Amino acid sequence: MEHVVPTYLSTKHHHPRDDDISFEEGPHIYTVCGDRGGFTSVTTWNHSHFAQFNADAIIDKMLKSPKMKDPTYKYYGKTKKQIKKMWDDKRDSSSTAGTKMHNDIEYYYNNEDVKNDSLEFSYFGNFIKDNSHLVPYRTEWMIYHEEMKLSGSIDM
């Protein structure tokens, strides 16, 4: 299901620079002042400063660990392929749940209907009750810097 970005707060608190920037989620490309892809996204810039996660190298090291002989160890008896699948499945389910939570909070603050009976969303409800003095200005705000040629999105 495609995420439809709610617009209540961005319309209410419109900024002239909002009209200069757009984002294509699939290829992760910003267009700024008509320049498509000429600005580096902050996400891309951040990733350039860290080594990519190397599951194979980490699992190879784990398989040599004495822990792998312990029947109580959660990876005991698992092959490299099985461990990698466990990690991939956990990554995917966590990402899906996190994205849903993020979107539901965004919908809530933009006066959209939200159907989420998860424990985590109830924690968000508690946060709202405990912090009723906080008033959202924007839930997402696309920004850019002309000289640095950086673009990104600030999320609440």
Name every feature range the model reports, one short phrase each.
Residues 1-100:
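Charged, glycine-rich intrinsically disordered N-terminal tails and low-complexity linkers that flank
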Residues 2-12, 20, 27, 86-156:
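Catalytic cores of nuclease domains that cleave nucleic-acid phosphodiester backbones
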